[in-house]
């Protein structure tokens, strides 16, 4: 009789406004296809802009520089990244509404959340659209085919907003300081964008397929 192994749990902390998360998503999509049911993926919100306030000029410069660094990556998606989100006249005040939209979409299934997430990433990071605005959220949710009455109720719920704040606090208590961050099998925490080969190597290690991976920066055991 064949032994059934429990899937490896991977938690991905991300912010839909983060260019690095967008690139990480593209790389992780390859591994989702590659490993199939051997891995159970959980995508959790970690807002980089937690509080509702316009970014200062200094903050905007830093955000633009991050996008410009991400543009230099070799991924095809990197060439599509734009700084318009932060240089335009309507920069996001906070990440919370956009992340709340994704949690509301999650109630309609993981695919619903994934479709809305990719739509929001493209709108924000390629087209420079402020996806934290309620009118934009509803437009994108409608375009990806969500059931809008259910989505609206969940999106407007204070409980959904509290969930985002609670997730941020719990992640910070676990040692998460930025995004993208992966926690693989409750064992390895990988902070920042990594090469596809490095993600794969850590996954194979936790699946018991290879020896302990080579050390990298911002990598540590989870306690």
Task: Give residue spans per PLM region.
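Structural alpha/beta surface segment adjacent to cysteine/selenocysteine redox centers
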Residues: 23-128, 133
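C-terminal cap of thioredoxin/glutaredoxin-like
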Residues: 3, 8, 12-13, 17-34, ...
């Amino acid at each position: 009789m064949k032994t059934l192994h429990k899937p490896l749990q991977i938690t991905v902390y991300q912010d839909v406004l983060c260019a690095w998360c967008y690139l990480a998503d593209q790389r992780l999509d390859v591994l989702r296809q590659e490993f199939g049911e051997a891995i159970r993926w959980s995508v959790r919100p970690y807002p980089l802009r937690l509080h509702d306030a316009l970014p200062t000029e200094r903050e905007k410069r830093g955000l633009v520089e991050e996008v410009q660094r991400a543009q230099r990556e070799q991924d095809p998606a990197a060439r599509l990244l734009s700084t318009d989100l932060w240089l335009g006249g309507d920069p996001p005040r906070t990440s919370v509404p956009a992340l709340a939209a994704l949690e509301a979409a999650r109630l309609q299934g993981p695919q619903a959340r994934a479709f809305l997430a990719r739509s929001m990433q493209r709108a924000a990071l390629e087209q420079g659209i402020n996806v934290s605005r309620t009118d934009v959220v509803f437009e994108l949710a409608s375009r990806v085919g969500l059931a809008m009455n259910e989505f609206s109720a969940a999106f407007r719920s204070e409980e959904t907003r509290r969930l985002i704040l609670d997730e941020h606090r719990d992640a910070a208590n676990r040692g998460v300081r930025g995004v993208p961050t992966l926690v693989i099998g409750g064992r390895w925490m990988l902070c920042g964008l990594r090469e596809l080969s490095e993600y794969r190597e850590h996954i194979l290690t936790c699946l018991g397929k290879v020896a302990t991976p080579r050390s990298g920066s911002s990598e540590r055991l989870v306690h």
